[in-house]
Amino acid sequence: MLSKVLPVLLGILLILQSRVEGPQTESKNEASSRDVVYGPQPQPLENQLLSEETKSTETETGSRVGKLPEASRILNTILSNYDHKLRPGIGEKPTVVTVEISVNSLGPLSILDMEYTIDIIFSQTWYDERLCYNDTFESLVLNGNVVSQLWIPDTFFRNSKRTHEHEITMPNQMVRIYKDGKVLYTIRMTIDAGCSLHMLRFPMDSHSCPLSFSSFSYPENEMIYKWENFKLEINEKNSWKLFQFDFTGVSNKTEIITTPVGDFMVMTIFFNVSRRFGYVAFQNYVPSSVTTMLSWVSFWIKTESAPARTSLGITSVLTMTTLGTFSRKNFPRVSYITALDFYIAICFVFCFCALLEFAVLNFLIYNQTKAHASPKLRHPRINSRAHARTRARSRACARQHQEAFVCQIVTTEGSDGEERPSCSAQQPPSPGSPEGPRSLCSKLACCEWCKRFKKYFCMVPDCEGSTWQQGRLCIHVYRLDNYSRVVFPVTFFFFNVLYWLVCLNL
């Protein structure tokens, strides 16, 4: 029974379900047909807000992009028929280029290589009628990518050894085109330029390091350079790496250089520097002066202390040699002597003379004493008549033999216990004696080599009463150190006064 009722119930349910879904589908179709016939129905509030924002964004974007197409149009217009290989005004008039330089840093200045480094911003301005335009833009600022499409002056630096153009993060170049055809081209570069240094007054020297530039291919009748009131901006707030020098100012010069291919206008700017004296003074002058004065200590050392005096003298000479070599270590190989070389050379001479003074003193005292090692001689006691006859014979012998003399070195004992050489005048032999005038002349001939010297100087301590000493300068051998203690410092002082007066006022 149930098997017959269940199929009937299922059929009734299916029929009822189909009747319920039918009106809903029909209502949807009617709604769609009404949209097509009578237009869109009102949208929700969210959709209206989104549409308004989209319209405002499109309006703002259009206003911002409005100048960009205009600038692109101007640039494309002026470059469409532009030939960057030809200069402006070719065949009609020369191109006038106005130059401005801004110095970022100066230095270091290498004395050994005779060059200096400078970091500059180099600006050139000229007029190109082909780049004129009529628009609201007063100027167009372009980066370095457009430089290759424009005519640029072929300026080069004549005394540069190395040139570096900065390219981080982009090439440091800028072009500004004005509506009247004026073009401004700016580039940053670092230049290693040569600087001829005249070191004659070193270390009181001053130098002018040039920076010359001109056109490489355009002569004077095609390109003219000029300064705009010689405008040079120098940023001294930066730490310039001049080290041993002080910056004193700038100057400029314009000249025409004749070459086989034409006359070129050359612009030169000079950077004036002067050397700082403190570094060289402590490195060279002070050690040289101290070493020279140290060599004079030997004058206060006893003559018997030969090793001490010799060591001090040799050490002083070698030290001055080392200082002279060290002063030329970082120095160009010039063929002339500088003021510092002259000072060190004079100090070397003073040290050498101090060593030579001891050698002369030692020679006069010990060598002559050893050569004339003989018993001590004393002045014989004679009566007044015998002394008168001796003096008369001495005068006659002196007149006969052209002021001949007899001087014998003997050893005497001084007041301080030291043995010193002494000179005793001997009675010349009588004409009738075996040792007559011929014998006297033969003895004098042996001393002919020292006659001229002893004619003017007496180098022995006790010669009072000698007839041959009259009219001569007597120098006490044992006082030679005393003389040196005064002569050397005084002479060195006057040399320094004269040296610094000449060097500072030259």
Curated annotation (Swiss-Prot):
<feature type="topological domain" description="Extracellular">
    <location>
        <begin position="23"/>
        <end position="280"/>
    </location>
</feature>
<dbReference type="InterPro" id="IPR006202">
    <property type="entry name" value="Neur_chan_lig-bd"/>
</dbReference>
<dbReference type="InterPro" id="IPR006201">
    <property type="entry name" value="Neur_channel"/>
</dbReference>
<feature type="region of interest" description="Disordered">
    <location>
        <begin position="413"/>
        <end position="438"/>
    </location>
</feature>
<keyword id="KW-1003">Cell membrane</keyword>
<feature type="region of interest" description="Disordered">
    <location>
        <begin position="23"/>
        <end position="66"/>
    </location>
</feature>
<keyword id="KW-0732">Signal</keyword>
<dbReference type="InterPro" id="IPR036719">
    <property type="entry name" value="Neuro-gated_channel_TM_sf"/>
</dbReference>
<dbReference type="GO" id="GO:1902476">
    <property type="term" value="P:chloride transmembrane transport"/>
</dbReference>
<keyword id="KW-1133">Transmembrane helix</keyword>
<keyword id="KW-0813">Transport</keyword>
<keyword id="KW-0406">Ion transport</keyword>
<feature type="topological domain" description="Cytoplasmic">
    <location>
        <begin position="302"/>
        <end position="307"/>
    </location>
</feature>
<feature type="topological domain" description="Extracellular">
    <location>
        <begin position="328"/>
        <end position="343"/>
    </location>
</feature>
<dbReference type="GO" id="GO:0098794">
    <property type="term" value="C:postsynapse"/>
</dbReference>
<feature type="glycosylation site" description="N-linked (GlcNAc...) asparagine">
    <location>
        <position position="252"/>
    </location>
</feature>
<keyword id="KW-0812">Transmembrane</keyword>
<feature type="signal peptide">
    <location>
        <begin position="1"/>
        <end position="22"/>
    </location>
</feature>
<keyword id="KW-0628">Postsynaptic cell membrane</keyword>
<dbReference type="GO" id="GO:0045211">
    <property type="term" value="C:postsynaptic membrane"/>
</dbReference>
<feature type="transmembrane region" description="Helical">
    <location>
        <begin position="486"/>
        <end position="506"/>
    </location>
</feature>
<dbReference type="GO" id="GO:0032590">
    <property type="term" value="C:dendrite membrane"/>
</dbReference>
<keyword id="KW-0472">Membrane</keyword>
<dbReference type="GO" id="GO:0004890">
    <property type="term" value="F:GABA-A receptor activity"/>
</dbReference>
<protein>
    <recommendedName>
        <fullName>Gamma-aminobutyric acid receptor subunit epsilon</fullName>
    </recommendedName>
</protein>
<dbReference type="GO" id="GO:2001226">
    <property type="term" value="P:negative regulation of chloride transport"/>
</dbReference>
<dbReference type="InterPro" id="IPR038050">
    <property type="entry name" value="Neuro_actylchol_rec"/>
</dbReference>
<dbReference type="GO" id="GO:0051932">
    <property type="term" value="P:synaptic transmission, GABAergic"/>
</dbReference>
<comment type="subunit">
    <text>Heteropentamer, formed by a combination of alpha (GABRA1-6), beta (GABRB1-3), gamma (GABRG1-3), delta (GABRD), epsilon (GABRE), rho (GABRR1-3), pi (GABRP) and theta (GABRQ) chains, each subunit exhibiting distinct physiological and pharmacological properties.</text>
</comment>
<keyword id="KW-0407">Ion channel</keyword>
<comment type="function">
    <text>Epsilon subunit of the heteropentameric ligand-gated chloride channel gated by gamma-aminobutyric acid (GABA), a major inhibitory neurotransmitter in the brain. GABA-gated chloride channels, also named GABA(A) receptors (GABAAR), consist of five subunits arranged around a central pore and contain GABA active binding site(s) located at the alpha and beta subunit interfaces. When activated by GABA, GABAARs selectively allow the flow of chloride anions across the cell membrane down their electrochemical gradient.</text>
</comment>
<keyword id="KW-0770">Synapse</keyword>
<dbReference type="InterPro" id="IPR018000">
    <property type="entry name" value="Neurotransmitter_ion_chnl_CS"/>
</dbReference>
<dbReference type="Pfam" id="PF02932">
    <property type="entry name" value="Neur_chan_memb"/>
</dbReference>
<dbReference type="GO" id="GO:1904862">
    <property type="term" value="P:inhibitory synapse assembly"/>
</dbReference>
<dbReference type="Pfam" id="PF02931">
    <property type="entry name" value="Neur_chan_LBD"/>
</dbReference>
<dbReference type="GO" id="GO:1902711">
    <property type="term" value="C:GABA-A receptor complex"/>
</dbReference>
<comment type="similarity">
    <text>Belongs to the ligand-gated ion channel (TC 1.A.9) family. Gamma-aminobutyric acid receptor (TC 1.A.9.5) subfamily. GABRE sub-subfamily.</text>
</comment>
<dbReference type="GO" id="GO:0022851">
    <property type="term" value="F:GABA-gated chloride ion channel activity"/>
</dbReference>
<feature type="transmembrane region" description="Helical">
    <location>
        <begin position="308"/>
        <end position="327"/>
    </location>
</feature>
<keyword id="KW-0868">Chloride</keyword>
<dbReference type="InterPro" id="IPR006029">
    <property type="entry name" value="Neurotrans-gated_channel_TM"/>
</dbReference>
